[in-house]
Amino acid sequence: MSATSLPISIAVSPRNTAVTVPPADIAVSLEHVSFRYNKEESEVLEDINLSIRPGECIVLTGESGCGKTTLTRTINGLIPLVYQGVLKGRVSVAEKPVTEWTSGDLAVTVGSVFQNPRSQFVNSEVEAELAFGCENQGLSREEIVRRIHESVRVFGIEELLHRQVEELSGGQRQMVILASVYATDPDIFVLDEPTAALDVTSMRCLGAALAKLKSMGKTIIVSEHRLWWLADLADRVVVMEDGHIAGTWSAKEFGAIPFETRLHWGLRAWKVDEVDAAAHRRFSHTSVSGHPVHECVADTSLRTRGLRVSYRHRDAVIDSCDFDISAGTVVGLVGANGAGKTTLARCLCGIQKEAAGTVELAGKALRTSQRAGVIYLAMQEPGYQLFEHTVVRELEEAHDRNGSDLPQIFSVKSLMDDFRLADLAQRHPLSLSGGQRQRTSIAAGLLYGAQALVMDEPTSGLDYNNMASIARQIDRLKQQGVVICIITHDYEFLCAACDAVLPLHDGRVSPPIPLTPETLGHIKRLLGFS
């Protein structure tokens, strides 16, 4: 929601956000809860009042940085046990204040999936990770084995059971963490951006698992930007703005709010049909297929020939990979979790060495060591490439390192404004929310001035306004002739930013498909929509 928009309570009348529920029917309650992190001047949460019944599925949404993750931390006890600050008000789980729970007992009752799944692993093997929580509960070996097999079946990850965690893709790691929490059988599930790295098939699998849990009377709290997969699952939608609850609706009431109004608030599509409609509007205003992606322009394209990439003790992750991406075309690299998309991106940018084949840019074959300066990777986990002490310094450093011969079309100030980073200028990048870190990393990449830009899941953790802003900046780079490849599972972003899709399956690419009204249905099926 922009600062100039009317308060939600005026624009559309929501339900009372402080509805009183009989005490016996409360699974989670927050009463006049406010919170300020240590070393921060302002409160991240302000006077939150929310009651959640057992068996409800509640969706928390709102613009990046509005306080969703912080609210979930008050419920699972990470605030105040891990994240220190000033907490006011009362947070209760099962009618008992969180401050009176032991950390072990609360972890058994409230199962959590964090925004960054990498931070949640404690074992190097998938099977050991799935067993870990059950072992801590003192369950018998037979029961642990039963739960492990049930959880991998429910989440469709049987083939990952005997894999090493370090071998998994981001989406596969996310599914393993979801399965490990499922195996512990908590009464309350708190999921923070659980689909950030998931493909459509995995999202549908997660939705089915949550529907099963809901039918069993489990309470589900999901903090999320990508909303379409929750439309048939949610009971209520809670929209947050600047640390407070701006409105609460039933799922039916929320879906009845006009799409354009929800977009104005910075919220993503509630139904896949809304994404389709937005895509067709884009088709009618722009010619997304105006660049012949199947033809290589020798002096302006990114090209691979016979590319093969493998990890030790494994078959090739990328095998015999040939493709061309012409400058002036935005290509979305799509494929299931574990298909090899991130591995391919790491190779293109010189982080991962190829076993065979070549990577060419502007007609010149580049060795691994030569790629880092000319092909920039905006990583899936942006915290790994943010090094400065403040956001503004991060962008200034990227601007100063710009070695491109192309005209500089971005300035630090313009991107700070466009990506809504101005108010965060003096914050440490690692103190930001996931979406804020993502915007900082992408802004740095735009300022770096590389001849080719590879973005790995750039919209994970981003609301509609920030997603649209990134799409606009990508279009500016496209007009300048920069080669752009975007790895994404985000159908909404794909329709907003890309001209074509490049399917990747089992380490091999298929011919690119222009994004047009005629091909949209085929592309949806490739992504996993029925």
Task: Label each region the model flagged.
Residues 61-63, 334-336:
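The feature captures the beta-strand-to-loop junction immediately N-terminal to the Walker
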Residues 76, 349:
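Helix-to-loop junction immediately C-terminal to a conserved catalytic motif
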Residues 164-168, 172, 428-432:
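Conserved ABC ATPase signature
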Residues 189-192, 453-456:
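Catalytic Walker B motif of ABC-type/P-loop ATPase nucleotide-binding domains
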Residues 224-225, 488-489:
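H-loop/switch region of ABC-family ATPase nucleotide-binding domains
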Residues 181-182, 445-446:
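ABC ATPase C-loop
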Residues 142-160, 406-424:
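Conserved ABC ATPase "signature" region
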Residues 84-96, 357-371:
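Conserved ABC transporter NBD signature motif
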